[in-house]
Design a protein with these regions (language model features):
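Class II aminoacyl-tRNA synthetase catalytic cores and aaRS-like
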Residues: 1-577
Length: 577
């Protein structure tokens, strides 16, 4: 063995004066009054090593080394209270190089300030940075915690296939050509949707897995290109509320244990309908740490003669203690409004005596002024901002203005995890061509069941679909599944699919549902997104050991890469120019 102790575990009073063997990487080399100091780093921490100059000849930073020496207390002036081992040091009798390090492309301790492309190319160096390695170790701890939690809740872990059939719904698939069956393809699963539903039909009451999911879609700060992981679970004989309670139990316990003592929404989490979320927050992913609320003033300006507002949807946001802000603040908000597509951002300011001023004040009809004050809940020293457009745009713009105001005014505190469920999504919507399509998951049960599908306007039908949102980030989506074959066929027919098409596209699911399928429901909290929140990471790639870059490239291994003509022939593929 190269070592019997790690840097932190050897920092003990009982070991003082004993000869120890350590191994790790050279984090730094310093000269202090003619004495050489080497900081030895392993995955537990750092230990200071005192060495002679001749022992450090030809040793470079980040080389891996083997150290033999005696543990002793540091001199008082050399104590470092910032690290666990700060009272101890090793007096080296021998230092040998195990692996020499070439010229470094960047300093490991400063790697988080290096361009991402370089960090990913030398990810093996980037991960030596204790901040980065700590995140990956935390990922392992959380995986362990979640598995134990699911076992404690009575769930059975089942791995579903990675090579499966392509699905016509959802995002773009990653396709894998078959060598054996010319012209046919496997697909990497976007989610274990069909398999987990079939497990419920198979008699499993509670299923879960930490499921890898593959989607060929563009990246965002909170969405990794290529692959991601989710805590996928499903329950048989379950209502929506049964799933909500399990989701609350999992997330509350997880964030209580790993959430750095931040405040957490206690169960039951607020239930907010999609309609209410769009009306009050302008988003179906509301950040409830932001206490600003959107209200509707369309009736106030109806028939007012003010062309910019009359006949349109008018939204407003009352911001307390904002009227004394300098003119530059209001100009900046107006510039932001224009940058997102608005004509401009009107406002009224109220002083301490509730005297109004601002460009919109004169357009409020006198006989509706009190109603305006009541609806907006205007108060001394507040400002009221106005957003006007056609309804979908007005809601969207109001949501963006609400977020911008909170960020500019420092209204969002980072000491809280605010959870909520978003419920009652529309089952259908119209696309740009006016065609009725599914809004979200096509396998969801419509509220009202088959009767609603037969007798209601499709655009009025709500689905048993739900999201979990935390601090403005969608952590999970889920649904009560449509387990009735007749209802499933009708749901797809409304979206333009014939019965034959449904059966041909989803033969295994349709066939399984014909054999006594139980009512079932589930959800799948995004594992990477949960880790982002728990580590205060702004980019999902920070919580993945070997992520693709934002262009879906693995710059470490060079994927996607060219393959030989022979490999292409074996899988019956020809590349077109």
């Amino acid at each position: 063995m190269y070592r019997k102790y790690k840097c932190v575990s050897c920092a003990s009073e009982e070991l003082i004066g004993k000869t120890l063997e350590l191994a790790g990487w050279v984090s730094s080399i310093r000269d202090h009054g003619g004495v050489k100091f080497l900081d030895l780093r392993d995955d537990s921490g750092i230990m200071q090593v005192v060495a002679r100059e001749d022992q450090l000849t030809h040793i470079s930073k980040e080389s891996s080394v083997h150290v033999i020496g005696t543990l002793r207390k540091r001199d008082p002036e050399l104590i470092n209270p910032k690290i666990q081992t700060g009272h101890y040091e090793i007096a080296a009798s021998s230092i040998s190089v195990l692996g020499k390090c070439d010229l470094l492309p960047f300093e490991v301790d400063d790697s988080r300030n290096v361009k991402e492309e370089l960090r990913l190319k030398y990810r093996f160096l980037d991960l030596r940075n204790p901040i980065n390695s700590k995140i990956i170790k935390l990922r392992s701890e959380i995986l362990h915690f979640l598995r134990n939690k699911m076992y404690d809740l009575g769930f059975t872990e089942v791995q579903t296939p990675i090579l499966t059939a392509s699905s016509p719904e959802g995002a773009r698939d990653y396709l894998v050509p078959s060598r054996k069956y010319k012209g046919k393809f496997y697909a990497l699963p976007q989610a274990p949707q069909i398999f987990k539903q079939i497990l419920m039909v198979s008699g499993f009451d509670k299923y879960f897995q930490i499921a890898p999911c593959f989607r060929d879609e563009d990246s965002r700060a909170d969405r990794a290109p290529g692959e991601f992981y989710q805590l996928d679970f499903e329950m048989a004989f379950a209502h929506q509320e049964d799933i909500f309670k399990i989701g609350e139990e999992i997330l509350y316990s997880l964030f209580s244990k790993f959430g750095s003592n931040k405040k957490i929404t206690p169960p039951p989490f607020p239930r907010i309908s999609y309609k209410e979320a769009m009306e009050k927050y302008g988003s179906d992913k509301p950040d409830l740490r932001n206490k600003l609320v959107i209200v509707d003033l369309s009736d106030i300006f109806l028939g007012s003669g003010f062309a910019a507002f009359d006949g349109k949807t008018v939204k407003s946001i009352m911001v307390p203690n904002c009227s004394s802000r300098p003119r530059r603040f209001f100009d900046k908000m107006n510039e932001f409004a224009q940058s997102i597509g608005m004509q401009g951002l009107g406002y009224i300011k109220f002083d301490e005596n509730m005297n109004p001023s601002g460009p919109i004040n004169k357009f409020i009809p006198d006989d509706r002024r009190q109603k305006f004050l009541d609806i907006t809940n205007a108060q001394p020293n507040c400002s009221v901002f106005f957003i006007s457009d056609m309804k979908p745009f007005a809601q969207k713009y109001a949501g963006e203005i609400r977020t911008k105001l909170a960020n500019e005014l420092g209204l969002i505190k980072n000491d809280t995890f605010e959870f909520c469920y978003i419920t009652d999504f529309n089952m259908y919507e119209k696309d740009e061509d006016g065609k009725v399509i599914f809004t979200h998951n096509p396998f969801s049960m419509p509220q009202g069941g088959l009767d609603a599908l037969l007798n209601s306007d499709p655009l009025d039908i709500l689905a048993y679909q739900y999201d979990i949102v935390c601090n403005g980030i969608e952590l999970s989506s889920g649904a009560v599944r449509n387990h009735e074959p007749e209802t499933l066929i009708k749901a797809f027919e409304i979206a333009g699919y014939s019965k034959d098409e449904v059966i041909s596209k989803f033969p295994s699911l349709y066939n399984a549902l014909r054999f006594g399928a139980p009512p079932h429901a589930g959800m799948a909290p995004g594992f990477d997104r949960m880790l982002m929140l728990l580590t205060d990471s702004t980019n999902i790639r920070e919580v993945v050991a070997f992520p693709l870059n934002s262009n879906a490239q693995d710059v470490l291994l060079g994927a996607p890469n060219d393959v030989s003509e022979q490999q292409l022939r074996e899988i019956h593929i020809k590349i077109r120019n």
